[in-house]
Amino acid sequence: MTMKMKMKMSVVCAVVVVALFLIDVGPVAEAVTCNPTELSSCVPAITGGSKPSSTCCSKLKVQEPCLCNYIKNPSLKQYVNSPGAKKVLSNCGVTYPNC
């Protein structure tokens, strides 16, 4: 086998390996639209200390990637950092972000 042929085989093998990794990646994550009003169902639990509804928890889980943006927003920071919000996050099984 010539050197040129070995080089071509190496390139083909590398392409096949990369293709196998790409095939196994799975579905691409959908982008989340960050909209704090989606969390309005959580307000009674945050402000009143009641148990969060299943709607609240499901919305929190969808909006979880947005929490750091909410914390960085001066208008929303006080609500997301409140003890009530932290309790709701915990009750819903959503980890408080470390931004």
UniProtKB/Swiss-Prot annotation:
Keyword hit for Signal: yes
Cross-referenced Gene3D superfamilies: Plant lipid-transfer and hydrophobic proteins (1.10.110.10)
Signal peptide segment = 1-33
Q: Keywords for this entry?
A: Disulfide bond, Lipid-binding, Signal, Transport
The record's annotation in SMART domains points to:
AAI (SM00499)
Query: In what tissue types does this protein appear?
Result: Expressed in most tissues except nodules.
Query: A Pfam family in this protein?
Result: Tryp_alpha_amyl
Family membership: Belongs to the plant LTP family.
An annotated Gene Ontology molecular function: lipid binding
- Which cysteine-cysteine pairs are annotated as disulfide bonds in the entry? C34-C68, C42-C56, C57-C92, C66-C99
Question: What PANTHER family does this protein map onto?
Answer: BIFUNCTIONAL INHIBITOR/LIPID-TRANSFER PROTEIN/SEED STORAGE 2S ALBUMIN SUPERFAMILY PROTEIN (PTHR33214), BIFUNCTIONAL INHIBITOR_PLANT LIPID TRANSFER PROTEIN_SEED STORAGE HELICAL DOMAIN-CONTAINING PROTEIN (PTHR33214:SF51)
Which protein is depicted?
A: Probable non-specific lipid-transfer protein AKCS9
SUPFAM superfamilies reported for this sequence: Bifunctional inhibitor/lipid-transfer protein/seed storage 2S albumin (SSF47699)
Q: GO annotations under biological process?
A: lipid transport
Entry-linked InterPro entries:
Bifun_inhib/LTP/seed_sf (IPR036312), Bifunc_inhib/LTP/seed_store (IPR016140), nsLTP2 (IPR033872)
Taxonomic superkingdom: Eukaryota
**What is this protein's function per UniProt?**
Potential lipid transfer protein.
